[in-house]
Structures are given as C-alpha cells and as structure tokens.
C-alpha cells in the first residue's frame, strides 16, 4: 500500500505538490478535513499567505497530532514558518520588500536524506517577505 501524505490545503491550489508526491509513490489526501489526517503517515504544510499572530487552531492541531504520534512533518515556505511559530519561534517581516515578477531560483546545500533524494545542491524557488527570526527550540 502506498504511504498516505496529508496535504493541508484547498484543492486546486497545490497541483505541483500533488504531482511530486504522487510521482514519488505517495497517496495524497488533499483537504481540510482533520479526520482524514488520522490515517496518514505524513503531513505536508505548503506555502501560502503571511502568518500574523498565532496559528489557526486547525494547523496547530495537525502539528501537535503528527508530532505526538512521531509521524513526519514537512513544512515548505509558509509551512516551515508555521512550524517555527507553533513551537515558540518568531518571524521577521521585511517591510518594503518588493516581490519580483516570477520566482527567484537559487542553489541550496542539502545534506543527509535530502541530499540523497535531491542531490547536494538542488535549486529552489523563493519569493518571501517574511523569514524566521528566532528559531524555535525544537527546530534547532
């Protein structure tokens, strides 16, 4: 049976994530129905809008539920920021930052499992005006 990954989001917004997970052999559950998350082996928190203040209860519930049961969580862009805020970290807004037309592509350095999956210098896209300021203790 394929591993199930719960992709927290609205259908129609995350086709790239969906396609990548399915091509890697995962069965993806894309919805906001918390009960569907109970049978999933992993959680993907994708990118999205800004985080202003505490996280919505749904995201906090999902993070707590997956962390308590030691199921893997992957936060991408806003998703990583959500994990940081949830566990006590802070974000920094970059006032006046102008978002470019299109995504910026730049190389990164991967280690461990990510390097085995993606190579040592995968290119990533980014378009942010918020960033992690103080890293939450569980993420250090």
Region roles according to the model:
Residues 1-74, 78, 85-92, 96-123, ...:
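N-terminal beta1-alpha1 cap of cysteine-dependent amidohydrolase-like domains
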């Amino acid at each position: 049976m394929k591993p199930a990954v719960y992709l927290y989001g609205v259908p129609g917004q995350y086709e790239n994530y969906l396609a990548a997970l399915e091509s890697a052999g995962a069965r993806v559950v894309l919805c906001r129905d918390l009960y569907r998350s109970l049978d999933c082996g992993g959680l993907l928190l994708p990118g999205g809008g800004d985080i202003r203040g505490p996280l919505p209860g749904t995201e906090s519930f999902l993070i707590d539920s997956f962390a308590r049961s030691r199921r893997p969580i992957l936060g991408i862009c806003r998703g990583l920021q959500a994990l940081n805020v949830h566990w006590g970290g802070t974000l920094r807004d970059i006032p006046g930052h102008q978002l470019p037309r299109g995504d910026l592509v730049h190389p990164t350095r991967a280690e461990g499992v990510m390097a085995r999956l993606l190579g040592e210098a995968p290119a990533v896209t980014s378009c942010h005006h918020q960033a992690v300021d103080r890293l939450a203790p569980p993420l250090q």
